[in-house]
């Protein structure tokens, strides 16, 4: 028998399904609440509301728990490299040695940004916040990387786009820092 939560309002009973999360925590699905009852929920600070189902992240702030794909963040920070964690987040498991070597190579091969993006860095106000610069340049990357929009082979495009963007963000962050301290790129 499927678990349900019963809500009584205005003399009527309504049922909502109970779901299990990635850590077997229980929640009830209120996505049909307004449609069924005319009611909405109010959750100050979003403390009791999950925004979506996630197989990637589990957060329990009250108990200090953060996991990515079932791995404690403390373990990943201590034992895994950036490319290993990136692979884990993208593909759902830690990479094999061969996958990791290929991924590292792809990150290196895709680190360069288009030369015309340097104009964006030069035109940013010196007082601009680094996150504002980073997000602006990330948005501009697609203008100079048309292969990110190639629909011929969606799996390859996903891999290239994902690796390309992860790799370029490292370069963009470095350039953003150089710009913030007034040094040339």
Where are these predicted regions, by residue range?
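Hydrophobic alpha-helical bundle cores within soluble ligand-binding/oligomerization subdomains
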Residues: 2-185
């Amino acid at each position: 028998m499927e678990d349900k939560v019963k809500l009584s309002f205005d003399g009527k009973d309504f049922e909502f399904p109970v779901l299990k999360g990635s850590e077997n925590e229980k929640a009830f699905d209120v996505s049909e609440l307004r449609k069924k009852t005319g009611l909405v929920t109010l959750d100050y600070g979003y403390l009791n509301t999950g925004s979506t189902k996630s197989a990637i992240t589990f957060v329990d702030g009250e108990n200090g728990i953060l996991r990515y794909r079932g791995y404690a963040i403390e373990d990943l920070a201590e034992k895994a490299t950036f490319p290993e964690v990136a692979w884990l987040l993208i593909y759902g498991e830690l990479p094999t040695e061969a996958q990791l070597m290929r991924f590292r190579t792809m990150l290196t091969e895709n680190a360069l940004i288009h030369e015309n993006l340097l104009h964006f860095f030069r035109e940013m106000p010196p007082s601009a916040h680094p996150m504002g610069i980073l997000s602006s340049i990330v948005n501009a990357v697609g203008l100079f990387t048309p292969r990110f929009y190639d629909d011929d082979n969606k799996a390859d495009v996903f891999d290239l786009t994902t690796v390309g963007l992860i790799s370029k963000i490292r370069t963009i962050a470095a350039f953003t820092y150089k710009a913030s301290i007034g040094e040339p790129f």
